[in-house]
Amino acid sequence: MQSTQPIQRCALGSQQALPELAVSLLDNLGLITMTGNDKKSYLQGQVTCDVVSLEADQVTWGGHCDAKGKLWSAFRLFHYGDGYAMLQDKSAIDVELRELKKYAVFAKVEINVSDAILLGVCGVQAEQAIAKLTNNAEAAVATFAQGTAVKISPQRWLLVVDANQQDEVLAMLATAPLCDHALWDLYDILEVSPRIPAFAQNEHIPQAVNLQAVNGISFKKGCYTGQETVARAKYRGINKRALYRLSGAIEPSAPETTISLERSVGDNWRAAGEALVSYHFDDGRATGLFVLPNDLEPETQFRLAGQSEQLWQREPLPYSLDDE
């Protein structure tokens, strides 16, 4: 359902402060739901996180792998209705749904793509706004009359609402501008949040997008698809990649333009990969998340593919890559 309120692009400069309060329409993200008597045991055997220990008021990162340990999706998991919900990149959701359902015929589970509307409330005033909406900003997952609120990070909340109640919820948040998903993407980039869009499916193991660093991998749970590869990456040190944020100047182009980088190798340049998610500022700069070798020298240079004069820089990670 299309909102009756106008949706705007939240125009920001690279040195500009983020809005104190804004709402993003998250139409580039999707939600897979799982219900049924066997939902917990079925999902536990499919994903990297510990579903059994997830409390009703908690949210966790997780990954779903193929048999070789390559990711179909990276998601945030939380209790929703009578089951679970997995928030992830919408472009990957059709393939992820097919793979997640592969063994469902042997279990009492229903797995579907939700048609709920996803809204992102963000900014330093987000928690205060959520407290008024739900009367409960203490729990990371809280239900209210129009839907479910999920705490993503200190300044971000996800709202899952029925389509016919979207405008009612937006009216309750009327002091916040309604923006497109780009602002939420920028928060994901600044927080270096794992993301697997369709073009990156079956390309990376969980540690290559830092799932271990955001507590998205349990090394104490039982078996799950791809576990052998994930365990080897931890205990034998076979993982050679990690997720990084890079920033730099970019020639004027549409916000949807794909950003690809090259990295210096001696006197030559080599393809470094495509941004999993990116954001274009209004002052000729951009930033994005890239999977890169985790042993690059500090002096390694980066440049935009096709714009060789535009050098980019790695930004500090907001967390440690250790999983201890």
From Swiss-Prot:
One of its GO terms (cellular component) is cytoplasm. Keywords: Cytoplasm, Folate-binding, tRNA processing. One of its GO terms (molecular function) is folic acid binding. Its main location: cytoplasm. It comes from the Bacteria. Folate binds at W184. It is found in: Cytoplasm. SUPFAM superfamilies: Aminomethyltransferase beta-barrel domain, Folate-binding domain. Pfam families: YgfZ_barrel. Folate-binding protein involved in regulating the level of ATP-DnaA and in the modification of some tRNAs. It is probably a key factor in regulatory networks that act via tRNA modification, such as initiation of chromosomal replication. This is tRNA-modifying protein YgfZ. It comes from Vibrio vulnificus (strain YJ016).
